[in-house]
């Protein structure tokens, strides 16, 4: 609808037109500030230009039946859509059903490679991982809904010092808790009950003879064993959030291409040796300094592995590559982009979204850390506490790059302070009305909208505005817009519902048709957020 109006106005005015929502609903459904943009060109006051353009638009043949009014106001041009247009758009939307909102031209479709979570398989997923996980999953849902092709990948760091440290930690726990030996732990090791669990499970699963090998062999065996167990648990944690990946890429497998990649970097004059280390000339591409790829002991840095991985990704020729990283990886972006340029790739195809920190409270106190994982809050614990849908909604309710703090008890309340409950409640009210109604759904769907007041028209307009919310959420990577849209629409519906009886009016079928439209938009919005909307709310909800 937004796109259609914009297209009509641009055709009439032969200028690019920005369409906005007026701050005051009494000013109409849409507004444009185009008169301000043209003031310098025509050397006239925006007020005069707005008046002239409003007259031109309102009398043009292409707008007949489209607007009830086109009014100039303080330099803006405000538009109120006609009921006839809203009715036609409503009928089309209700016919589209679950596809309503997915309106994109095929020539704009993209191939998107989306990598997110990619947490080291050295421990359970904690709440910090969940924010990026939920965001990435919903971004993929929205992108696919808009007709884009998306591959979701989890990059598994299954080699290197962290994996060896995992094996060492399990081996020491095995000696202490299975063999009952006195053990001296190093300054840095993986703590938590999960390490002890793995050690005890290894005692049951692995051949006793394996524990008679030399210590380095034992650590290597336990590293692989523990890594596999943690990856299974990570997948279970993601499943609890409703998240499934198309692909899991192994760093160990990807790193087999290291020599070929380094050879290309050398040919590109991207490397040099200094202090017995191999450096990348990343400072040539806006990095703060050059970066070490190979250390003095000939082992590779994490960056070396990431360079090989990104080269493998870019060989697949996607339109766009999106990484979702923790905010602490901000400085990492320039060095990865530098490597892509050296390897002959277009680094502008890579977009990195940074997820800020999450702080959970319960009864206004910091959420209790998990004994099992040490100093972390586990995803599973919070999902068990409040449910996946509530957790997904709250994680998506603020921009990814802003800090998020919330009290989980808010998500258990059954009032308007709990946004997800309030939205579920709106949909529940609609379905309860439909059940009580003497009219069939088919009767309601076939009823023409001919007698709506301004408030009813505005509620219908809000329900029909889902496509713009979907498009903006994707284009701006602002998934909070979907949450805001659903909250606002639910709030407008509750105001409409509380204003008076719906079923006991002569135009009950028309009002129920609006309700069906509201329900469809809320359902589709929630589906894109990875949430199943409720049609009934019981006392236990």
Swiss-Prot record:
Main location: cytoplasm
Cellular component GO terms held in the UniProt record: cytoplasm
The protein's enzyme class: ligase
Record keywords: Aminoacyl-tRNA synthetase, ATP-binding, Cytoplasm, Ligase, Nucleotide-binding, Protein biosynthesis
Keyword field contains Ligase: yes
Compartments where found: Cytoplasm
Motif stretch ('HIGH' region): 119-129
Catalytic activity: tRNA(Arg) + L-arginine + ATP = L-arginyl-tRNA(Arg) + AMP + diphosphate
MF term (GO), any: ATP binding
GO BP, one annotated term: arginyl-tRNA aminoacylation
Cell membrane keyword on record: no
Stored Pfam families: Arg_tRNA_synt_N (PF03485), DALR_1 (PF05746), tRNA-synt_1d (PF00750)
PANTHER family: ARGININE--TRNA LIGASE, CYTOPLASMIC, ARGINYL-TRNA SYNTHETASE
Assembly mode: Monomer.
UniProt name for this protein: Arginine--tRNA ligase
Organism: Helicobacter pylori (strain P12)
């Amino acid at each position: 609808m937004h796109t259609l109006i914009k297209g009509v106005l641009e055709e009439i005015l032969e200028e690019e037109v920005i369409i906005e929502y007026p701050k005051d609903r009494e000013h109409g459904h849409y507004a444009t500030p185009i008169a301000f943009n043209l003031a310098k060109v025509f050397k006239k006051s925006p007020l005069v230009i707005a008046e002239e353009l409003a007259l031109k638009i309102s009398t043009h043949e292409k707008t007949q039946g489209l607007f009830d009014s086109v009014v100039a106001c303080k330099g803006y041009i405000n538009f109120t859509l006609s009921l006839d247009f809203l009715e036609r758009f409503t009928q089309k939307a209700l016919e589209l059903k679950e596809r309503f909102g997915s309106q994109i031209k095929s020539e704009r479709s993209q191939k998107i490679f989306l990598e997110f979570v990619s947490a080291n398989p050295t421990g359970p997923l904690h709440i910090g991982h969940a924010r990026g996980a939920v965001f990435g999953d919903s971004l993929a849902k929205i992108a696919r809904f808009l007709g884009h092709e998306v591959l979701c990948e989890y990059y598994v760091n299954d080699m290197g010092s962290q994996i060896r440290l995992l094996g060492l930690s399990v081996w020491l726990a095995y000696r202490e808790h299975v063999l009952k030996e006195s053990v001296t732990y190093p300054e840095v090791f993986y703590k938590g009950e999960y390490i002890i669990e793995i050690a005890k499970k290894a005692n049951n699963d692995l051949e006793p003879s394996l524990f008679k090998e030399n210590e380095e062999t034992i650590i290597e065996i336990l590293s692989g064993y523990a890594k596999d167990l943690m990856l299974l648990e990570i997948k279970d944690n993601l499943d609890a959030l409703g998240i499934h990946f198309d692909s899991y890429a192994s760093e160990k497998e990807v790193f087999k291409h290291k020599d070929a990649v380094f050879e290309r970097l050398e040919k590109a004059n991207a490397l040099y040796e200094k202090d017995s280390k191999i450096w990348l000339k990343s400072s040539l591409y806006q990095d703060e300094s050059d970066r070490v790829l190979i250390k003095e002991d000939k082992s590779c840095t994490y960056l070396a592995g990431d360079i090989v991985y990104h080269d493998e990704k870019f060989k697949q020729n996607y339109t766009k590559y999106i990484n979702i990283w923790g905010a602490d990886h901000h400085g990492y972006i320039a060095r990865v982009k530098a490597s892509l340029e050296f390897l002959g790739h277009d680094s502008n195809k890579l977009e990195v979204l940074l997820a800020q920190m999450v702080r959970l409270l319960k009864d206004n106190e910091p959420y209790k850390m998990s004994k099992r994982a040490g100093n972390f809050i586990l995803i599973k614990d919070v999902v068990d506490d409040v449910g996946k849908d509530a957790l997904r909604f709250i994680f998506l309710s603020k921009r990814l790059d802003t800090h998020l703090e919330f009290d989980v008890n808010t998500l258990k309340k059954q009032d308007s302070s709990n946004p997800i409950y309030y939205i579920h409640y709106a949909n529940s009210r609609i379905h309860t009305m439909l059940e009580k109604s003497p009219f069939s759904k088919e009767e309601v769907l076939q009823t023409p909208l001919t007698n709506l007041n301004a408030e009813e028209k505005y509620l219908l307009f809000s329900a029909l505005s889902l496509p713009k919310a979907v498009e903006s959420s994707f284009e701006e990577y602002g998934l909070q817009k979907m949450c805001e849209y659903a909250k606002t629409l639910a709030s407008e519906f509750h105001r409409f519902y509380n204003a008076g009886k719906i079923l006991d009016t002569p135009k009950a079928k028309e009002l129920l048709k609006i309700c069906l439209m509201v329900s469809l938009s809320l359902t589709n919005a929630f589906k894109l957020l990875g949430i199943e909307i409720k049609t009934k709310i019981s006392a236990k909800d």
